[in-house]
Amino acid sequence: MKEELSIDIIGLAGAYSYALDCIEAELVNIKNKHGKRVAYISICMAEYWKIQGDELQDLAMCALLHDNALTQYISEELKKDSVINCKKDLSKKKTNLHCIYGEKNITKIPFKTDVSNVILYHHEHADGTGPFQKKWNEIPLFARIIHLADTIDIIGNNTGSGNNSWNFICQYLLKNMDGLFDSECVNAFFHAFTHSESFICLRDNSFEMKLWEIIPRQKQVFDWKTCKNVADFFAKIVDYKSSFTSRHSIGVAEKAAFFAQYIGYDSINVQKIYLAGALHDIGKMAVGNEILEKPDKLTDDEFSKMKNHAGYTYLILSEVNDFEEIRDWAAFHHEKLNGKGYPFGKTAAELNEPERIMACIDIYQALTEDRPYKKGLSHEKTCEILDDMAQKGFVDSDISKKIRECFGGI
């Protein structure tokens, strides 16, 4: 496929940083917008070195996604731990593992400059006492900047607001200069934030407008391979959230794209539907695992919270510029033709073909995939269920029939 798709990639990274914040809030009580605050502190510090253009945008991208492997780390290393044990492990052990995973994941993002080892070393200490025992002169500048920004935001989160918080941060930086942080980065921070008033925007959330003023939201043009890599990167973050759906987003993306090709969609729309499939469950990042992985039937209140995930998908993807079409394809996957779906209760007249496809493919993937608590159903049995849903007015009967044809020989 040679046709290319334009995407607001920095906006998509910003949207996903919110989803990552939901995980960190669940585990270590960090307030929302942590990723964006780290990005803002980082780009303000960057002025000290006169970093501009593509380098500045790539620094912001790395900062927004610095904890991109958090769900993967928890899933692979702490599978059976309680939240309390997760907190303990996240703060004291194996910090390097999420850095290793994150560094590998980030290679799928099309950066314009070299960001090698930025995510890998973003928890290193200037004096060599960090996870990889690298000293400040062995650590990429962007990693050093993000490490300080990340630490300062966590400290600020735990010390409240106002002059007391600012004074504590100043004392902490000076105390740990040449230990946790190199003097150059400490100087860069004080160059950017000269007094408590200059730091206050991080507490009243006015910083976000300033962040997007400094970092332009320019769309990038991606070929199919790059688009798929970007989609897979974000889908992986979502799928690692729960062991119950470990390949669900990727599976939906692959089947939706395959089906779209089968019924004659052009390459641009195949790419769009792949991306929508990869992103459709991003809202589940805002739903606790005690609900996502509950072995018993959900209570009415729990089911209501579970249903919120589709609304969160809509809300999160609304942050991305010129993304309304893909957002809707992704977020409406639980809508039903008879108006009994969610989050908006759309009716048949309000649901276009790609949105109907996503609803059917999501059901097909969920029923056919293996999960810890069940074996996946056969193609035939799944199609019988889809046909029954079509007869009852839930899903599109033509799409249900074509799914039977499309996947029957696989």
What are these regions (language model features)?
Residues 2-410:
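Histidine- and acidic-residue-rich, metal-dependent catalytic cores
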